[in-house]
Curated annotation (Swiss-Prot):
Coiled coil: none annotated. It comes from Borrelia hermsii. This is Variable large protein 5. The Vlp and Vsp proteins are antigenically distinct proteins, only one vlp or vsp gene is transcriptionally active at any one time. Switching between these genes is a mechanism of host immune response evasion. InterPro entries: Borrelia_lipo. A lipid is attached at residue 19 (S-diacylglycerol cysteine). The keyword Transmembrane does not apply. SUPFAM superfamilies: Variable surface antigen VlsE (SSF74748). A lipid is attached at residue 19 (N-palmitoyl cysteine). The lineage of its organism: Bacteria, Pseudomonadati, Spirochaetota, Spirochaetia, Spirochaetales. The keyword Nuclease does not apply. GO terms for cellular component: cell outer membrane.
Length: 340
């Protein structure tokens, strides 16, 4: 019996060897189907990278530095650049081997790169460069009697964010979302009046009692809008964001956008109270972290969805199953949660 089993195993081995040593060249189409599979794995790595990026964003805290936000955009830049390089290599290999789908694939890749990838890469670089190595915290509240500071590089931040938002969000989101009602009594906001979020950007936030109301109003504004609303407000108001947030009848979206820009800007800082107010500082910092987390979580997911759609078009041009996507934008992506 043992000899018989050994003979069967030897026969199977010889068959396998003969099948794999026939000297037959690999079929070009099979080779590129393999390339397509490899590309699919590359796509999976890209999407996994975006999941990691979102995880980092959701890990932002009052101790997070502005340079960490800059690093987020640098990671976006590098990740998209890697995708661009892989796509260009696929096209080069297809053309060299005379693949019949090379021309259509080249067109699809060029469209994706020109209309989407390059714009995200450039926008991310602009934002990252504007923030640089700023070591101050994102939730930066001034000392007692310190005025709010918009920070530097606002125009560059706005330019870079706009380049990305225009591609991945389009018109989604409303820069003037929410209401103009302040948290204290739901009356309309005045021009940075006492107890209003506009005081974050003023000469000071007021005494302890009023400063607490300022922080509560800021938290109300951020909580009332979406990440897309915040991004659109940042893009729309730009260098005027802080001033617009301090105007009468300022909407929640306007205030939240100004908070997010101040969080990102080098040297950006919220006004301090006129006297010690630990509660004001804590709640104001929380609103700042919430604003930037909402904005960047939304931005990352929108980038993923946009690139996923573009890669599907490339797969269609390569004549492979465009619906056989490694993972979808909604899969394996941490979502921000709120406690009711």
């Amino acid at each position: 019996m043992r000899k018989r089993i050994s003979a069967i195993i030897m026969t199977l081995f010889m068959v396998l060897v003969s099948c794999n040593s026939g000297g037959v060249a690999e079929d070009p189409q099979s080779k590129f189907l393999k390339s397509a599979i490899d590309l699919g794995n590359d796509f999976l790595n890209v999407f996994t990278s975006f999941g990691d990026i979102v995880s980092k964003v959701l890990g932002f805290s009052t101790e997070t530095k502005k340079s960490d936000v800059g690093a987020y955009f640098k990671t976006i830049q590098d990740t998209i650049q890697g995708t661009k390089d892989k796509l260009n290599k696929i096209v080069t290999d297809m053309k060299r081997e005379g693949n019949p789908n090379a021309s259509a694939t080249e067109t699809a890749v060029k469209t994706l790169i020109d209309n989407t990838l390059d714009k995200i890469i450039e926008g991310s670089k602009t934002v990252s460069d504007a923030i640089g190595d700023a070591s101050d915290p994102i939730a930066n509240v001034g000392a007692n009697n310190a005025a709010g500071v918009a920070g530097t590089g606002i125009e560059s931040l706005t330019k870079g964010i706009k380049a990305i938002v225009d591609v991945v969000l389009g018109k989604e989101g409303n820069a003037e979302a929410g209401t103009d009602k302040k948290a204290e009594d739901l009356s309309a906001r005045t021009a940075a009046g006492n107890g209003e979020a506009g005081k974050l950007f003023a000469a000071n936030a007021g005494d302890d009692a009023n400063a607490k109301k300022v922080a509560a109003d800021a938290a109300k504004a951020v909580g009332a809008v979406t990440g897309a609303d915040i991004l659109q407000a940042m893009v729309k108001n730009g260098a005027n964001a802080a001033a617009d947030a301090a105007k009468a009848n300022a909407k929640d979206g306007t205030i939240a956008g100004a908070i997010a820009l101040t969080v990102m800007a080098k040297g950006g800082k919220f006004a301090g109270p006129t006297a010690d107010s630990a509660d004001y500082v804590t709640v104001a910092k929380g609103a700042a972290v919430s604003a930037i987390t909402k904005a960047l979580d939304t931005l990352t997911i929108a980038i993923r969805k946009t690139i996923d759609a573009g890669l599907k078009t490339v797969k269609e041009a390569m004549k492979i199953n465009a619906n056989d996507t490694p993972i979808s934008p909604e899969q394996n992506t941490p979502k921000a949660t709120t406690n009711n």
